[in-house]
């Protein structure tokens, strides 16, 4: 097949391939052969890196709500602000400490640039804290060295080392606070690896990194510049060359400029990282920080405990939306409104069959469905494990088929339609969606079903030519049955009698008196619930003249439900003929 694509005409000559800017060579890479088996150390940076990117930065009340959420979910390292950058951030750090809001097993993290007055102010904000991470950073990339700082490699290294020494100096003012240091060569992805490791190792030496006093070296994709495999190669290269490696906690801080932040984090973790920084639902500058929800639940669906509680994902989303004053996208993995929703007919049918197989397999294994291995097509996770219901799993539009329609009727109304009846009713729905367009809600679908198959509940409703009233039966010695029934025909109530080898056959005899030729082709019934007051649903496939249609009857009496189903099929056939 010929490729008909043509040049775009866009100014591609203005952009430089990454490999022409930064060299990352690792022919003996080992990360592709590894698999993730446990969760990393997490650090949530919503309150700083996320907050700085908001149109309306969080108020103190919204910050506290976000902090409480992160603690409740199980995050043990939380970046809470840049206290030397604003009075608001300084005051919030003080509020957390003085108000005793920080659990003993949670470590707050504060950010600072490598300037003495900023570092001094940072340490002032931490007075009284039990433990804290002081996060020092300066930019090291080729572009920022040239454009922003107008400094060579040695000049940028001096900035980092001066900042590290000042941190150690002011640490002496916090005798009762255990300080862990973190250093980030900002814009790491735009920095030569040999230079990045030179700076990081020099800073780690000043911080006296050791197995007993580890230093966090954080390698940010401040701007995502290449494919995730390149980021992973750079992380493995750094992991091999950082020293002392046992004294280093290697941390990742991916952004999502190319849309692959999650993949970069996962591959970077395989490549030797120990820790990942990010935000819930990927908030952050430009296209955002890496999404901690996606990362954590990607592990969960692989049978790995993320060490974070996502069991009420809707509450997490609502809180994040309130605090950030930004919506979470409907297609956002795991948390969006539509992520567990199937509109496609083939998808719906597979999901329906998957649920049925799951129940069957769990019963055969003697286990509750909630404890059985989850395997349902198109649903990588059980929505109930995230606090969701199955209500929105299947929704109906013009792309839907019988599986989705049948699923909704069964789950919302306990109606288990026979396969051919499913096909027939899905055609009714398809005709409606093709005509009107849009989605058919569960309530609308039920209304359409009632209008099509069941007697109208409205006094002035015109359901069809026939309506069944009270009846009685008699059985003679030969087993033949006589049906005495009150039937409404064209709005007029009449008393009719018919005979046959059962109640349905007797009703067909009555209908035959009006010249209505009916043959029953298929029949099934089931209870709609359990207990003495349970109602039954009956489904009857009838040939009425040249038309083959299904009827449905619902009643607390099984005989009545079957007779109603025949009337339903006959009325539908007559309506169809008149149309």
From Swiss-Prot:
Give the family this protein belongs to, as stated in its UniProt record.
Answer: Belongs to the alpha-IPM synthase/homocitrate synthase family. LeuA type 2 subfamily.
Q: Which domain of life is it from?
A: Bacteria
Pathway the protein acts in:
Amino-acid biosynthesis; L-leucine biosynthesis; L-leucine from 3-methyl-2-oxobutanoate: step 1/4
Indicate the quaternary assembly: Homodimer.
Q: Where is the Pyruvate carboxyltransferase domain?
A: 40-314
Its source organism is Arthrobacter sp. (strain FB24)
What the protein does comes down to:
Catalyzes the condensation of the acetyl group of acetyl-CoA with 3-methyl-2-oxobutanoate (2-ketoisovalerate) to form 3-carboxy-3-hydroxy-4-methylpentanoate (2-isopropylmalate).
Q: Where is this region: Regulatory domain?
A: 456-579
Which PROSITE patterns does the entry mention? Answer: AIPM_HOMOCIT_SYNTH_1, AIPM_HOMOCIT_SYNTH_2, PYR_CT
- Cofactor(s) needed: Mg(2+)
Q: Does the keyword GTP-binding apply?
A: no
Q: Which UniProt keywords apply?
A: Amino-acid biosynthesis, Branched-chain amino acid biosynthesis, Cytoplasm, Leucine biosynthesis, Magnesium, Metal-binding, Transferase
**Cellular location of this protein?**
Cytoplasm
Give the protein name, as stated in the record.
2-isopropylmalate synthase
Leading EC class: transferase
One of the GO BP terms on file: L-leucine biosynthetic process
InterPro entries, per the entry: 2-isopropylmalate_synth_dimer (IPR013709), AIPM/Hcit_synth_CS (IPR002034), Aldolase_TIM (IPR013785), IPM_Synthase (IPR005668), LeuA-like_post-cat (IPR054692), LeuA_allosteric_dom_sf (IPR036230), LeuA_N_DRE-TIM (IPR039371), PYR_CT (IPR000891)
Q: Which EC number(s) does the record attach to this protein?
A: 2.3.3.13
Q: Which GO terms describe its molecular function?
A: 2-isopropylmalate synthase activity; acetyl-CoA C-acetyltransferase activity; magnesium ion binding
Q: Name one GO cellular component term.
A: cytoplasm
Q: Which reaction does it catalyse?
A: 3-methyl-2-oxobutanoate + acetyl-CoA + H2O = (2S)-2-isopropylmalate + CoA + H(+)
Annotated residues for binding of Mg(2+): 49, 253, 255, 289
